[in-house]
Regions:
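Hydrophobic alpha-helical and helix-loop surface patches within well-folded domains
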Residues: 20, 36-37, 75, 259, ...
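Solvent-exposed beta-hairpin/edge-strand motifs
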Residues: 73-125, 177-180, 216, 220-221, ...
Length: 591
């Protein structure tokens, strides 16, 4: 007989207190219409003035049930001008991004960014438009009817700003051009209407489409980015296969690079004359490209390549099949930033592996699922942080991560714990541009967003959570899901009601806090009283450990769940009546 000396481990999701004493069938609810925008652009870059001339043809299909009388374009480079909204916000917020600070306010005319629109036509007819900050507003000559496709033709000029945030020229590592948010980009229109947000420095949301881009630039420059190069034997620079003969087609000292990118919502590229270009072909035929400055941190970049391959293999198996044929890791920008088929990452860092894994995993959430990051950044940053953390643990466990590259960091939940016990936390439902503090935004989007997914494994069981991750990807890829969409997937997989989970964890800042109020022995029976201290209810697992080392699980589901998660260990398990959220205490007995 076991001795009645035991420890009680009270589990309530993410907070734990210890006291002694490829394509599946699409469901109807994911048949959400999507707008489509096919881009054809030709760009001529002047590396002396840092300006480029561009023409854009955009075929826009209105798959909505609505008649559209206007359209909006994002002109992101206009944010890099003194007195822009990004500049004012950065100089007025209590905790400015150190990369930005007051730097925009000090830019000269040669250092600012801009996008000047010379003409805009709808089906060959000039359209009136007005540029307001980083948004172009166009009143259409003829409304776009549901199901109709129209063509917009645009002539424009851009000036690449001195690198401050994400995009720009001549970053601190000497990369000449990080060309992100560089072209006039049509705003998204969805079931919530237009999303023509000003560019304040936060997140993005785009229209699915096919891109065909031709970039003319001085012949010594090497380009990496979104899309598949169509003319590698006219370009070389490492794009040719072994044994192939390259015959560069140079005109006026420039090469014209021809890229296509199918079914993406953005196109990014970077260019530098000193890029080394390495390639790794995975067993499934996918190609990983690596662009970095020659002679800098070569050991780390070489070590990164097989680890990136292992990361993609794990992600394909556990989070969904990556749908494109390549991915590029490119030295550029000001940290790490995700784009379809690519990431821009600073190369002189100890966290090269960790940031690469994180940014690559964005291609599952930002790139393929494509939620509205401005409204729900946690569905991208948080889920990506969760997934990249799992990959890091996997690489450590199979011995793949023994390298000079660092082991990626501490669980993202640690930052959430710090902010949850402060007075600066804001709900996850806050628009990304409207957080009062940069720190509150990043902790919510990355930390609490990762906890959302990790903690869900406690609520419904890790097996159901992992199955739901795959079903979420396969059901909602290329469809811009929202918080209810992802929750419904996990409800179907688990058979449990989960609306309460978002109502508390996403739309409020109520905390989870449970404790053991009392333990009283009465003969051969021990009565345990639990108390709900915090304002967010959770199901509770109590693990009783006896003196002889054996364990027993006592489980109390929430009544709101309308069911229970399955047992997850081989230890004996007692399922008690559910706990109504209105009741501050709960008593059960251990025989």
């Amino acid at each position: 007989m076991r001795k009645r000396i035991f420890a009680i481990l009270l589990l309530t999701g993410w907070v734990t207190t210890t006291l002694v004493g490829q394509e599946q069938a699409t469901r109807k609810d994911s048949d959400r219409w999507q707008q489509y925008a096919n881009y054809y652009m030709e760009i001529d870059m002047n590396v002396e003035t840092n300006r480029f001339q561009g023409v854009q043809k955009l075929e826009y299909t209105n798959n909505s049930p609505d008649e559209l009388n206007q359209v909006f374009y994002h002109l992101y480079f206009n944010a890099f001008q003194p007195e822009s909204m990004m500049d004012v916000r950065s100089r007025s917020i209590q905790d400015p991004d150190r990369r930005v600070g007051d730097r925009i306010s000090k830019l000269s005319n040669e250092e600012i960014g801009y996008q000047k629109i010379f003409s805009l036509k709808q089906d060959g007819e000039q359209v009136e438009f007005e540029v307001v900050g980083t948004v172009l507003e166009a009143k259409l000559n003829e409304p776009i009817q549901p199901g109709e496709t129209v063509t917009f033709d645009m002539e424009f000029e851009g000036q690449v700003p001195l690198q401050i945030r994400r995009s720009g020229r001549d970053n601190r590592e000497g990369i000449r051009y990080t060309m992100t948010q560089w072209y006039p980009k049509l705003a998204e229109y969805d079931y919530q209407g237009w999303h023509a947000d000003e560019y304040i420095g936060r997140e993005f949301y785009g229209v699915w489409g096919d891109y065909e881009i031709k970039i003319s630039i001085d012949e010594e420059y090497v380009i990496g980015g979104t899309g598949y190069l169509q003319n590698p034997l006219e370009i070389g620079h490492g794009y040719e296969n072994p044994g192939q003969t390259v015959k560069k087609k140079v005109e006026n000292g420039k090469l014209t690079w021809h890229f296509v990118a199918p079914n993406v919502h953005d196109f990014a590229w970077a260019a530098d004359p000193d890029y080394a270009h390495d390639k790794l072909t995975m067993d499934n035929g996918m190609v990983l490209h690596f662009f970095h400055q020659k002679g800098q941190n070569e050991e780390n970049w070489k070590a990164l390549m097989p680890l990136a391959e292992r990361a993609f293999e794990y992600a394909n198996e556990n989070f969904g099949q990556y749908p494109y044929k390549q991915f590029s890791v490119i030295q550029g920008g000001d940290g790490g930033m995700e784009y379809p088929m690519s990431t821009m990452i600073t190369g002189n860092r100890g966290s090269l592996l960790g940031v690469t894994i994180h940014e690559a995993l964005h291609d599952w959430y930002h790139g393929v699922l494509g939620n509205n990051e401005a409204l729900t950044p946690w569905m991208d940053e948080g889920f990506t942080s969760y997934a990249s953390g799992r990959i890091s643990r996997h690489l450590r466990s199979d011995g793949s991560e023994e390298t000079t590259i660092e082991n990626i960091g501490t669980p993202a939940g640690g930052s959430y714990l710090r902010i949850a016990t402060s007075d600066i936390e804001e709900p996850l439902s806050t628009h990304s541009d409207h957080y009062n503090l940069n720190g509150a935004y990043s902790t919510a989007a990355y930390g609490k967003g990762a906890v959302w997914m990790s903690q869900l494994g406690y609520v419904i069981g890790e097996e159901a959570r992992d199955k739901g991750l795959l079903e979420y990807f396969n059901t909602w890829k290329f469809k811009h899901p929202n918080p209810n969409d992802v929750l419904r997937v996990f409800e179907r997989v688990s058979g449990l009601e989960l609306d309460w989970y978002n109502e508390y964890f996403v739309y409020t800042t109520k905390n989870i806090d449970y404790g053991v109020q009392n333990v009283v022995g009465e003969g051969k029976q021990t009565n345990v009283t639990l108390e709900k201290i915090g304002l967010m209810p959770m199901p509770v697992d109590v693990v009783v450990t006896y003196k002889d080392g054996t364990k027993e699980v006592h489980y109390m589901a929430l009544r709101m769940m309308r069911g229970e998660k399955p047992a997850e260990t081989n230890d004996p398990r007692v399922v008690h009546p559910d706990w109504p959220w209105t009741n501050p205490t709960y008593e059960f007995s251990i025989d």
